């Protein structure tokens, strides 16, 4: 009952907040608008990553002689998103829907969008259209497809979009889009972070945790994308999750280079532990004291993981050294450490 009550309290808090922020859009540069949504109902992103500050699902509109909508949002926000798009369009009709990534939190509303704007042309690569046909069996895109190859361009007027394929960052069909006019990179899931946009928090921590959980296994693919990005004059990064990045872009690019090449970000050490009766905790505390006395530049971080496996693996990812103190149940690791032990297989 307590869990049910907590859910409904959170739900109604969300509904009140949603009403207050209804049709809240944001202009980026001269002709680009943010039309994304905040999700404060989600507790576990993708069913496993704790997101205490929710998530954002980002979408954008480019208004030029031709109008392009960049990606859709999660299925739980159809009406809110379509309302924001309509507000920005202000009676105009979109010419293109650009689909960079087919994961449902970004692609769920393709069919709903096409019902609202049936004359729109969908812009995507071949793999994306194959996925689309399987996702939306009843959707007819005959005569409404614009298939792009890597490096192809699309002219909207003064805005020229260049499509750069980024397979396995983190799905096989992913591509990013560069607007050479406003020098904006629409980066798909790259440079995303956990957290809704109406909550202010440090980028590095939640972006690192997002990267490890969602993209971390695909370091070589991210490195390839970074090399392509290095040839572009990028002044703004518009990801599909998290804030729009407009300042100090070198910092974000450097972080992605470190994470994707698995370099050491900090010389500290983390000791993660779980403890039933307190004995493992005491051992972990003693180990941390000993490690701290060794003159480590960044000291020692002690973390009780409990049920939040993403916190444990996220905490040790940037460090040179990590220790684990765990207890066993019937000769097996408890689930949180079984997860952390397998993390190298992912990253």
Predicted regions and their residues:
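Metallo-beta-lactamase
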Residues: 22, 27-30, 67, 74, 124-247
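Conserved beta-strand hairpin/beta-sheet module of binuclear metal-dependent hydrolase folds
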Residues: 25-87, 176-179, 183-187, 280
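Active-site neighborhood of phospho(di)ester-bond hydrolases with catalytic His/Asp-centered motifs
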Residues: 70-72, 94-102, 122-125, 185-188, ...
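Active-site metal-binding motif and surrounding structural segment of the metallo-beta-lactamase
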Residues: 76-123
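Short helix-loop-beta junction
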Residues: 285-300
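Helix-loop-strand module that forms the ligand-binding subsite of alpha/beta enzymes
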Residues: 304-347
């Amino acid at each position: 009952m307590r869990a049910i009550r907590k859910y409904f309290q959170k739900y109604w808090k969300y509904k009140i907040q949603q009403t207050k922020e209804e049709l809240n859009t944001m202009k980026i540069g001269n002709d680009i608008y943010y039309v994304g949504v905040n999700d404060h109902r989600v507790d576990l992103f993708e069913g496993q990553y704790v997101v205490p500050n929710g998530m954002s699902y980002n979408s954008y509109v480019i208004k030029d002689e031709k109008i392009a909508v960049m990606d859709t949002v999660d299925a739980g926000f159809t009406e809110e998103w379509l309302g924001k798009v309509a507000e920005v369009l202000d009676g105009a009709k979109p010419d293109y829907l650009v689909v960079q990534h087919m994961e449902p939190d970004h692609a769920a509303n393709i069919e709903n969008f096409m019902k609202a704007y049936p004359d729109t042309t969908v812009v995507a690569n071949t793999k994306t259209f194959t996925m689309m046909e399987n996702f939306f069996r009843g959707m007819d895109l005959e005569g409404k497809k614009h298939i792009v190859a890597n490096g192809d361009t699309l002219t909207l007027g003064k805005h020229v979009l260049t499509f750069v394929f980024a397979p396995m960052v983190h799905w096989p069909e992913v591509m990013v889009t560069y607007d050479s006019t406003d020098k904006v990179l629409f980066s798909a899931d790259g440079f995303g972070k956990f957290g809704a946009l109406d909550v202010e928090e440090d980028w590095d921590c939640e972006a690192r945790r997002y990267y490890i959980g969602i993209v971390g296994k695909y370091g070589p693919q991210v490195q390839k994308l970074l090399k392509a990005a290095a040839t572009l004059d990028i002044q703004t990064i518009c990801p599909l999750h998290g804030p729009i990045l407009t300042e100090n872009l070198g910092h974000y690019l450097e972080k992605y280079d470190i994470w994707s090449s698995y370099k050491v970000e900090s010389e500290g050490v983390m000791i993660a532990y779980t403890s039933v009766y307190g004995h493992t905790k005491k051992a972990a505390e003693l180990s941390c004291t000993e490690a701290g006395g060794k003159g480590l530049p960044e000291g020692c971080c002690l973390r009780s993981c409990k049920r939040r496996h993403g916190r444990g693996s996220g905490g040790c990812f940037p460090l040179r050294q990590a220790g684990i103190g765990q207890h066993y149940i019937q000769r097996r690791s408890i689930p949180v450490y079984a997860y952390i032990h397998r993390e190298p297989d992912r990253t």
